């Protein structure tokens, strides 16, 4: 599961009062993921012992980052859903994989839209120091983790682990 959007980076956490905007964010990033996963599991119920589910998560799911309340709370909710699924369905392999700072359009979006100065500084340093990961590099690491199979059910595994 790799759907994801950042949400509104122009609003401070203490000013998040647009309920429709919140609903829309959580609908895409949490509720639709749960719904899709539920339908998938219904269809493949007979082969559950061969199912591997990978949720693309973020360090933001477990560590708060000022200016990213939508993103952090959405990733945290989704990651917990998959941890509970792993606890209930012990024969399904579930991995919460955090790919690290990846060179995608997300970086530019944060630099343009974020009102939180510290957040912009963090992402600017990723970009300027060349620490952004190419998508294919972090995807290879995810595959290594999956093939090694040494992760606990629902575990959060970061690229840098």
How would you describe each model-predicted region?
Residues 5, 15-35, 78:
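Catalytic Tyr-X3-Lys loop
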Residues 5-6, 19, 45, 50-77, ...:
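Catalytic loop of short-chain dehydrogenase/reductase
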């Amino acid at each position: 599961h790799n759907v994801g959007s950042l949400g509104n980076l122009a609003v401070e956490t203490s000013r998040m009062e647009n309920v429709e905007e919140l609903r829309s964010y959580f609908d895409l990033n949490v509720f639709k993921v749960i719904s899709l996963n539920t339908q998938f599991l219904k269809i493949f119920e007979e082969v559950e012992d061969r199912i591997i589910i990978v949720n693309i998560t973020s360090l933001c799911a477990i560590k708060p980052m000022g200016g990213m309340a939508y993103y952090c709370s959405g990733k945290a909710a989704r990651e917990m859903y998959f941890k509970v699924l792993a606890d209930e369905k012990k024969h399904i392999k579930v991995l919460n994989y955090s790919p690290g700072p990846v060179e995608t359009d997300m970086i530019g979006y944060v630099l343009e839209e974020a009102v939180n100065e510290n957040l912009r500084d963090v992402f600017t340093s990723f970009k300027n120091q060349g620490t952004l990961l190419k998508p294919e590099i972090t995807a290879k690491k995810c595959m290594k983790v999956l093939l090694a199979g040494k992760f606990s059910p629902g575990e959060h595994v970061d690229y840098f682990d």
